[in-house]
Amino acid sequence: MLETSQTIPELVNWTREREFSLSLSTERLAFLLAIAIYNNERLDGEMLETDLIDIFRHISNTFEQSAETVSTRANNSINELVKQRFLNRFSSEFTEGLSIYRLTPLGVGVSDYYIRQREFSALRLSVQLSIVADEIQRASESAEEGGDEHYWRKNVFAPLKYSVAEIFDSIDLSQRMMDENQQHIKEEIAELLTKDWQTAIASCERLLDETSGNLRELQDTLNAAGDKLQSQLLRIQDCVIGHDNLYFVEQLIVDLQAKLDRIISWGQQAIDLWIGYDRHVHKFIRTAIDLDKNRVFSQRLRQSIHHYFDHPWFLWIAQAERLIDLREEELTLREEEALGELPEELQYESLADLHEQIVETMQSLLIEYRLQNTPIDLSEVLTAQLKQYPLANHFDIARIIIDQAVRLGLAQDDLNGIYPNWRSINENGAEVQAHVIDKY
C-alpha cells in the first residue's frame, strides 16, 4: 500500500486543521461518476457550468425528482463537490459568470474506484505482471553492472519504487475490489434463495462457478509469475549485500517481496474461503430440497388422513439406502471388506473415536507447549502422530490434527504475510505447508 513518511499524529492534525470531510449521498455520487465519464470523453478535460447542469438534469430525471428546481439543486451539488474538493473551480475577471471546472485528484480517485477498478481480469493482470517482469529484469541487470549511489537511485531504486511498487499496489487494490465483489455475490445468492430457491438454484450455480473460475484463473496467473519475480528480486538483493550505503535499495526489495507474498497468499486464501462458502450454499440447497419434499409429503398425508373414511388407503413404509453424496463434508475412514473374524484388538475404529483420541493427544501436547512457552511445529507433530497409524488413515488423521491446531493457535508469520515452505510429514511423499504456531 502507500508508504508515507508522516506519522499518525501529524496526519491527524493536518486533517483537523484543513477540516477535511467527505459526505456523498447516492445522488451526489451518481453526479460525480457522470462527471467523470463525461470528462473522459473530452479532449481538454475542462467543463463549463452549463455542462455540469445538463449532467445533473439527467441525474435528476433518473432519480425522478422535480424538474422545477433543477438549477437550484444543481448549483448546490456543484458547490458541495467544490467544497469537498472533488471539483476545482476556475474563474477570472475576464470570464465573469463563466467558470471552468476540473476534477481534482480526489474526484478522479473516487470515480476511478467505482468505475475502472472493477475491470479486473486475467488479461489485465497478465499485462501488469509482464510490465513488472520487464522492469525488474532491467533493474537486476543494472544492479549487476553496479555504479555509484546516483546510478543505483536512477537505474534500480526508481523503477522499483515508482513502477513495480505502484503496480503491486494496483494489484492489491484490485484484489480488495474482488473481495467486495464476492460479498455482493453472496448477498445476491442469499436474496435469490430467500425468494424462490427452486428457480434460483441454476442462477446460484452460475454465480458460484463463475466466481470460482475467475479466482482460480487469476491465482494461476499470479503463481506462474510469482516465482520468476521473486528470483529477480533475489538477484538484486544479492548485489547490495555488503554495501551499507545501499540500505534504501535493500529495504525496498524486502518491502516488494513482502507485498508479492501477501498478494499470492491472499489469492489462495480467497479461493479456499470461497470453496467453503460454495459447500455451505450447496448444503443449504440440499437441506431446503429435503425439507420441501417432507412438507409436500406431510401435507398430502394430512389430507389423506382427513378424508380417510371417504377414500380408504393402505400405507407401506420402505427405507432405501442413501446415495453417496459427493459434496459430503464429514469424510469417513476407508472401509475395506475383510474375510473371517478379527480379534477385538483389530476391530475397526470409527472416525469419531479416532477424533476423540487425537483431540486428547493434541490437548496434552498443547498443555506442555503452553507451560514451557514453546512454539508448535505442525510438521513435527504430524510426523510423530502419523507414525502411529496405517498409511490408509494418514489423510484423515492429518486433517483432524490440522483442524484442531488452527482452532487453538496461529502463527505470527501468517500475520506478516510470509509464504510458508512445504515440509515432509511421512515417508510416502506427503507434505504440509504451515508456519510454526507461536500464538495461542
Swiss-Prot record:
This is Chromosome partition protein MukF. Keywords: Calcium, Cell cycle, Cell division, Chromosome partition, Cytoplasm, DNA condensation. GO terms for molecular function: calcium ion binding. The gene is mukF. InterPro entries: Chromosome_partition_MukF (IPR005582), MukF_C (IPR033441), MukF_C_sf (IPR038198), MukF_M (IPR033440), MukF_M_sp (IPR036141), MukF_WHTH (IPR033439), WH-like_DNA-bd_sf (IPR036388), WH_DNA-bd_sf (IPR036390). Residues 208-236 are annotated as: Leucine-zipper. Belongs to the MukF family. Its main location: cytoplasm. Coiled coil: none annotated. It comes from Histophilus somni (strain 2336) (Haemophilus somnus). Interacts, and probably forms a ternary complex, with MukE and MukB via its C-terminal region. The complex formation is stimulated by calcium or magnesium. It is required for an interaction between MukE and MukB. It comes from the Bacteria. GO terms for cellular component: cytoplasm; nucleoid. It is found in: Cytoplasm, Nucleoid. It holds the Pfam family KicB. Involved in chromosome condensation, segregation and cell cycle progression. May participate in facilitating chromosome segregation by condensation DNA from both sides of a centrally located replisome during cell division. Not required for mini-F plasmid partitioning. Probably acts via its interaction with MukB and MukE. Overexpression results in anucleate cells. It has a calcium binding activity. The keyword Cell division applies. One of its GO terms (biological process) is chromosome segregation.
